[in-house]
């Protein structure tokens, strides 16, 4: 079951943490960069859920890895544009690094 996957749970928890942060973006960016960040996080969750049920997991896990890298870049851009604080960026980076380690471990099982 997908809820049993720690990496899925951590990504879901990241989305719960992220939502109020994105809602504080400037109004002009909330529905541009903010929405893109939330959508990318949801894409990552979707890729993990799909990989969990598919027989051929490798391609979906690689897709999840790319989505994670894109998400890291979008969070960094948000920091550089000062939409998130250094502290929020640090929390996000820590959470994304943990997700990345868990995802890499999962990928190693199927490569």
Which residues make up each language-model segment?
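Amphipathic alpha-helical assembly/interaction segments
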Residues: 1-111
């Amino acid at each position: 079951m997908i809820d049993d996957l720690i990496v899925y749970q951590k990504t879901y928890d990241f989305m719960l943490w992220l939502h109020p942060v994105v809602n504080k973006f400037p109004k002009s960016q909330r529905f541009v960069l903010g929405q893109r960040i939330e959508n990318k996080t949801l894409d990552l969750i979707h890729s993990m859920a799909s990989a969990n049920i598919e027989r051929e997991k490798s391609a979906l896990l690689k897709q999840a890895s790319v989505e994670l890298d894109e998400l890291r870049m979008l969070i960094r851009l948000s920091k550089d544009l000062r939409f998130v604080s250094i502290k929020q960026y640090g929390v996000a980076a820590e959470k994304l690094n943990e997700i990345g380690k868990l995802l890499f471990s999962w990928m190693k099982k199927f490569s």
